[in-house]
């Protein structure tokens, strides 16, 4: 394994809600692919501890989803806060991609980046300023070639590592059926 500036860093966060001023990160996962979307390594999947008071602020959808997946219990049991999760993630990424080289990759990744900027600024700064957002291709396909949309189905577990794997697979699907490389 050696750091390669062409590798891509994929990330997904699970949060208590969508507002970084009010809500918090409760899970983070990363993986690294090469430029052809082959998964090279999966980083740690970390439940980020939050207080019972913070968890009580979740809306009904988040309570149902994160309780059903077991994430709420993992968050309560976790001993890792934001900073510890950030450092563990950075330690993994530094083995695979030099700082400032990979765009931040994922689905609706701008939302995740807002939370990173607020709660994990060192990790946020590790990425290039560009985005590789799979949801952009989905939106374009919806408008320009809607017949391909039914060809890829997500499981929607709302577990960070599952979601990242699906994002990589979804981009590969669009590469084959929409971009046609």
Curated annotation (Swiss-Prot):
<comment type="similarity">
    <text>Belongs to the oligoribonuclease family.</text>
</comment>
<dbReference type="Pfam" id="PF00929">
    <property type="entry name" value="RNase_T"/>
</dbReference>
<dbReference type="InterPro" id="IPR022894">
    <property type="entry name" value="Oligoribonuclease"/>
</dbReference>
<comment type="function">
    <text>3'-to-5' exoribonuclease specific for small oligoribonucleotides.</text>
</comment>
<comment type="subunit">
    <text>Homodimer.</text>
</comment>
<keyword id="KW-0540">Nuclease</keyword>
<dbReference type="GO" id="GO:0006259">
    <property type="term" value="P:DNA metabolic process"/>
</dbReference>
<dbReference type="GO" id="GO:0005737">
    <property type="term" value="C:cytoplasm"/>
</dbReference>
<dbReference type="GO" id="GO:0000175">
    <property type="term" value="F:3'-5'-RNA exonuclease activity"/>
</dbReference>
<keyword id="KW-0269">Exonuclease</keyword>
<dbReference type="InterPro" id="IPR013520">
    <property type="entry name" value="Exonuclease_RNaseT/DNA_pol3"/>
</dbReference>
<keyword id="KW-0378">Hydrolase</keyword>
<feature type="active site">
    <location>
        <position position="129"/>
    </location>
</feature>
<protein>
    <recommendedName>
        <fullName>Oligoribonuclease</fullName>
        <ecNumber>3.1.15.-</ecNumber>
    </recommendedName>
</protein>
<dbReference type="InterPro" id="IPR012337">
    <property type="entry name" value="RNaseH-like_sf"/>
</dbReference>
<dbReference type="GO" id="GO:0003676">
    <property type="term" value="F:nucleic acid binding"/>
</dbReference>
<feature type="domain" description="Exonuclease">
    <location>
        <begin position="8"/>
        <end position="171"/>
    </location>
</feature>
<dbReference type="InterPro" id="IPR036397">
    <property type="entry name" value="RNaseH_sf"/>
</dbReference>
<keyword id="KW-0963">Cytoplasm</keyword>
């Amino acid at each position: 394994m050696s750091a390669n500036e062409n590798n891509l860093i994929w990330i997904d966060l699970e949060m208590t809600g969508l507002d970084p001023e009010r809500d918090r990160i409760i899970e983070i996962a990363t993986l690294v692919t090469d430029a052809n979307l082959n998964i090279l390594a999966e980083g740690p999947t970390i439940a980020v501890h939050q207080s019972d008071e913070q968890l009580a602020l979740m809306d009904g959808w988040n309570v149902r989803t994160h309780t059903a997946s077991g994430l709420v219990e993992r968050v309560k049991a976790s001993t890792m806060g934001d900073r510890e999760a950030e450092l563990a993630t950075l330690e993994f990424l530094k083995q695979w991609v030099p700082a400032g080289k990979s765009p931040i990759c994922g689905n609706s990744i701008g939302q995740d980046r807002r939370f990173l900027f607020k709660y994990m600024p060192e990790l946020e700064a590790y990425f290039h300023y560009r985005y590789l957002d799979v949801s952009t291709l989905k939106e374009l396909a919806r408008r320009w070639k809607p017949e391909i949309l039914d060809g890829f189905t997500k499981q929607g577990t709302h577990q960070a590592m599952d979601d990242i794997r699906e994002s990589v697979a979804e981009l590969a699907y669009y590469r084959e059926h929409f971009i046609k490389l």
